Amino acid sequence: MTESHEDGEGELLSRIRELTGAALPIVVSLDLHANITERMVSHASAFCIFRTYPHIDMAATGARCFPILQRLLSGEILYPAMRQASFLVPLSAQYTGASPCKELYQLLPQDSAAGQAHCDIAMGFPPADIYDAGPAVVAYAASQAEADEHAQRIIEAMETKETAFDSALLSADSAVAKAMSHTGSKPVIIADVQDNPGAGATSDTTGLLKALVDGKATDAVLALLHDPQTVAAAQELGEGGIFDAALGGKSGLPDMGSYQARCRVLALSDGEFAFSGAMYAGATAQIGPTALLEIVDSESSVSVLVGSKRCQCLDRAILTHIGIDPGEKKIVAVKSTVHFRDDFEPIADLI
């Protein structure tokens, strides 16, 4: 969606078709969270959609587009079918590494060779809150009947799993208490799913930070809190400096004030580093000046990484670049919904 169009992709494809005519094949790669509309399907020759969340198959999805485009250019006709689910799936329940999404994606044909049906699933993006928000299945085949059969088969399988999409979330206090009671040797990861900037959140709410301090969490770190003003104050003081900070809560959201705390500046960074996880491996991050702060004058042991730009904490390098080894922490709190799993799950006992 855009500020002026509820169906931005449909509008874009419609304008392209006006220029190219109906004969030109157009194969489109889409995000797993796409909200697919009939208008989009009517103007595109085919869709290829990410099949992993975390999205570690972005390049592979582009590669899957090519053989389908070749088929269309060779003269093969692919008939489209689309089915929409009757329910919404929260982003936190769209993880493809576990049931029920794992089983649904196993239903998709893996071969895009000539003559083979092509199917994909989009899980939708509920926060968009548009008419067509929600999961959908697209299928393309040599006949309309075959395309309809594939789309119907997959959407019916999805409908049977509606109650399996777990939307239950812990309160911040409960999550901290559970993490503190854990006795394993590896960290507990707490995902602050309601404040994920990758889904449009402000990344500056402080409820989880307060819960960590009030819950007397030990050896805990939270990342990444968006607060340019606090970063600037820390940069001016320098490492080792102590100051009274009003952390986060500056986005203007109702009932989302700053967290007042006395902080020590542990480390500073220009925020430029290389991502190391599979999702963005090799890409250079430029998240602006950052400051690692320690909450002092409390019975807890909590540090918080504060940034001057919003960045979903989906890669361990966000922490390691400033000297924090998340694998050595007891609790790692991340402002992310699912993307963090690819890089953080291997070091964790519990999420």
Which positions does each model-derived feature cover?
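Active-site histidine-anchored catalytic micro-motif
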Residues: 1-73, 187, 192-209, 213, ...
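Short acidic, glycine/serine/threonine-rich loops at helix termini
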Residues: 4-7, 37-42, 59-61, 92-99, ...
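Short alpha-helical segments and helix-capping/turn motifs at coil-helix boundaries
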Residues: 11, 207, 288-289, 315-320
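Short, structured patches in soluble enzyme cores that scaffold and shape functional sites
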Residues: 30, 51-52, 84-89, 139-141, ...
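C-terminal functional extensions of proteins
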Residues: 66, 73, 78, 345, ...
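Internal, active-site/partner-interface "lid" segment
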Residues: 73-101
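Hard-cation-handling environments
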Residues: 92-301, 305-309
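Catalytic centers of hydrolytic enzymes
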Residues: 298-351
